[in-house]
Amino acid sequence: ETLPDWVIIENVSDKSRQRILELQIDRGESSAIALALEIPKSTLILDDFKARKIAQQLGISFTGTIGVIIKAKLNGIIPSIKPYLEKIKETNFRISAEIELQALKEAKEY
């Protein structure tokens, strides 16, 4: 499947920074964080707790998958977050009842 035209694939310039991050987090997250440090005003989508903590320490803006879904609802792109939360729960993605309730409140569905 081909990617939409608005998707741009970038490579990290500073591979040493990425390798240092790989000592603490997975390659995907380390690559994303290293690239965010090279692209001003970027916002990462991170769900991994450790990666989010590192991004926060480095001053990188981030959100999670659920945050993207909430934003899509609030911007009128999707009518409801509930079906997406249900799909997420069918995967190995862990979402607590507390986080789900918070998401529903933020999306004005509770």
PLM regions and their residue ranges:
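Short glycine-centered helix-capping/turn motifs at secondary-structure transition points
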Residues: G76-I77, N92, K108
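Long, amphipathic alpha-helical surface segments
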Residues: F93-A97
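Short alpha-helix plus adjacent loop in nuclease-associated cores
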Residues: T63-L74, I78
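Short beta-strand scaffold positions
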Residues: I45-L46
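Alpha-helix capping/helix-boundary segments
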Residues: K50-A51
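Active-site-proximal, substrate-binding regions of enzyme catalytic domains
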Residues: E1-S42, L58-I60, I70, P83, ...
